[in-house]
UniProtKB/Swiss-Prot annotation:
All residue ranges annotated as the Protein kinase domain in the record: 44-298
Superkingdom of the organism of origin: Eukaryota
Regulation: Allosterically activated by various compounds, including ATP. Activated by cAMP; the nucleotide acts as a dynamic and allosteric activator by coupling the two lobes of apo PKA, enhancing the enzyme dynamics synchronously and priming it for catalysis.
Protein's gene: PRKACA
Topology term for the membrane: Lipid-anchor
Expression tissues: Ubiquitously expressed in mammalian tissues.
Subcellular location: Cytoplasm; Cell membrane; Membrane; Nucleus
BP-aspect Gene Ontology terms: cellular response to heat; negative regulation of meiotic cell cycle process involved in oocyte maturation; negative regulation of TORC1 signaling; signal transduction
Protein name: cAMP-dependent protein kinase catalytic subunit alpha
């Protein structure tokens, strides 16, 4: 690298530092003083279910007063308690109301009633990366790199706030109208200084240290990034099998095979991200995220332009207007039932 290029890189890294320091101030204000009860169920018209989970659903809703569309996550308090997800749910809301980044879905309102917790988020009509990836088969390397760069920046932001995301997968990445990513579902995200021990995540994306019940840190997110880049570029994940136990055996073995069409730069980056040895895994070394940002596979990436959303997206989802749901699957609809008595008031008092 020439002197001029090195100087440019140095000043970019300095301005990133300044940006993150300011971002942390903003985050901490909201983290310490979380917004509560900023809307009410009656203010929204419920339109259609966009997804379902073990303790709730996500619905497209329309704000009656403004006509704006949102995605409303509805969680059944009693089910959350039964599934021992109280802590995770409180984490999700507390984190979402405090963060602010171009590739993180925005929490617009949150509230609760006798039966449910509600998180009202920006509606991202392009649907999940998962469905586009399965339809197209696999993404070209430039296409995969465009998305990967946004995740790198997002993790750099989250990690600087001591947040581990822990649930990276194509199902949790929505594609917006401009073709950029919106990361959703902070159900497993956690603020951790140092190490944590909870087993959570999706089998194919779990880092070896989580499987081996070791204390782990934010390096698990960089491992998951390696899995995601592999899956985007190959069309299937690097470790798969019928049973989770077989997947886990493959993950901890430290052996990865690459499709012949992967470029040598891509294989090199993935070997450094899918690195079982934490003392060698990119993102976890003394240069931190810069080992990833300065890797040859990202040589053509203009990080600032990606952050500013100035790079032309490789793919724009088709959609026919603000309330269009054609990029989401259909689900059976269900009434939202609200009890006349308060359920689990104590457990969710801080929500």
């Amino acid at each position: 690298m020439g002197n001029a290029a090195a100087a440019k890189k140095g000043s970019e890294q300095e301005s990133v530092k300044e940006f993150l320091a300011k971002a942390k101030e903003d985050f901490l204000k909201k983290w310490e003083n979380p917004a509560q009860n900023t809307a009410h169920l009656d203010q929204f018209e419920r339109i259609k279910t966009l997804g379902t989970g073990s303790f709730g659903r996500v619905m497209l809703v329309k704000h009656k007063e403004t006509g704006n569309h949102f995605a409303m996550k509805i969680l059944d308090k009693q089910k959350v308690v039964k599934l021992k997800q109280i802590e995770h749910t409180l984490n999700e809301k507390r984190i979402l109301q405090a963060v602010n980044f171009p590739f993180l879905v925005k929490l617009e309102y949150s509230f609760k009633d006798n039966s449910n917790l509600y998180m009202v988020m920006e509606y991202v009509p392009g649907g999940e990366m998962f469905s586009h990836l399965r339809r197209i088969g696999r993404f070209s390397e430039p296409h995969a790199r465009f998305y990967a760069a946004q995740i790198v920046l997002t993790f750099e932001y989250l990690h600087s706030l001591d947040l581990i995301y822990r649930d990276l997968k194509p199902e949790n990445l929505l594609i917006d109208q401009q073709g950029y990513i919106q990361v959703t579902d902070f159900g497993f995200a956690k603020r951790v200084k140092g190490r944590t021990w909870t087993l959570c995540g999706t089998p194919e994306y779990l880092a070896p240290e989580i499987i081996l019940s070791k204390g782990y840190n934010k390096a698990v997110d960089w491992w998951a990034l390696g899995v995601l880049i592999y899956e985007m570029a190959a069309g299937y994940p690097p470790f798969f099998a019928d049973q989770p136990i077989q997947i886990y055996e493959k993950i901890v073995s430290g052996k990865v095979r690459f499709p012949s069409h992967f470029s040598s730069d891509l294989k090199d980056l993935l070997r450094n991200l899918l690195q079982v040895d934490l003392t060698k895994r990119f993102g976890n070394l003394k240069n931190g995220v810069n080992d990833i940002k300065n890797h040859k596979w990202f040589a053509t990436t203009d990080w600032i332009a990606i952050y500013q959303r100035k790079v032309e997206a490789p793919f724009i989802p088709k959609f026919k207007g603000p309330g269009d749901t054609s990029n989401f699957d259909d689900y059976e609809e269900e009434e939202i039932r609200v009890s006349i008595n308060e359920k689990c008031g104590k457990e969710f008092s801080e929500f």
